[in-house]
């Protein structure tokens, strides 16, 4: 008599079949679009990877050491980072590191290309922030692997789904910071710039 109060009811909600059918429908009807997009992104990623592979290992380490010195004003940190980079190569992972770096550079480029215009538009339209903020909050709280699942389902495994998942995750701070930065410009500066044309 009280079993329905203690045990969860047997509802048997099946969402796997509709999702499988939707993915199958997308792949059948729009598969060529995804294949073309995957090829274009692969060419872009491989181009960056090829450019990174052309940089000699010793030059890459020196660039990291001197960039760290310039940015952090510390040779000690530069030498540490250079040593760690050397260890990556010594362990035989130099090419894999370049592949990962190419994925990250590609994701950063696309995040900026997508996020900057959206952030500018959000700053220009009053009230849009109240609509978009919950969406951005939800996007930022999800782990990147959540975005990887649909990307792999539609594009297959590889570098391109990794780039797409990273872009979706990284575009949120770009949008937020662009919008916030534009809104925080002092009104007197805006008026002065308008008066000068």
Label the model's feature ranges.
Residues 89-101, 114-116, 175-183:
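Juxtamembrane membrane-interface segments at transmembrane alpha-helix termini
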Residues 76-86, 103-104, 132-140, 167:
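Cytoplasmic-side transmembrane-helix entry/capping segments in multi-pass membrane proteins
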Residues 65-67, 85-86, 116-121, 148-150, ...:
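Alpha-helical transmembrane segments of multipass membrane proteins
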Residues 77-80, 96, 119, 130, ...:
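Alpha-helical transmembrane segments and their helix-entry boundary regions
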């Amino acid at each position: 008599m009280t079993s329905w109060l203690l045990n969860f009811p047997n509802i048997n909600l099946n969402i796997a079949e509709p999702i499988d059918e939707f993915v199958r429908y997308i792949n059948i009807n729009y598969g060529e679009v995804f294949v073309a997009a995957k090829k274009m992104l692969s060419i872009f990623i491989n181009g960056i990877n090829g450019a990174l592979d052309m940089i000699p290992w010793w030059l890459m380490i020196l660039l990291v050491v001197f960039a760290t010195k310039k940015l952090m004003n510390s040779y000690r940190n530069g030498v540490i980072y250079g040593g760690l980079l050397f260890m990556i190569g010594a362990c035989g992972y130099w090419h894999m590191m370049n592949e990962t770096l190419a994925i990250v550079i590609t994701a950063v480029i696309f995040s900026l290309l997508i996020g900057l215009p959206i952030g500018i538009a959000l700053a220009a339209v009053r009230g849009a922030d109240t609509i978009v903020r919950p969406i951005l909050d939800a996007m930022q709280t999800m782990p990147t692997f959540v975005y990887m699942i649909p990307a792999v389902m539609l594009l297959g495994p590889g570098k391109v789904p990794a780039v797409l998942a990273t872009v979706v995750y990284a575009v949120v701070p770009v949008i937020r910071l662009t919008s916030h930065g534009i809104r925080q410009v002092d009104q007197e500066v805006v008026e002065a710039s308008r008066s000068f044309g």
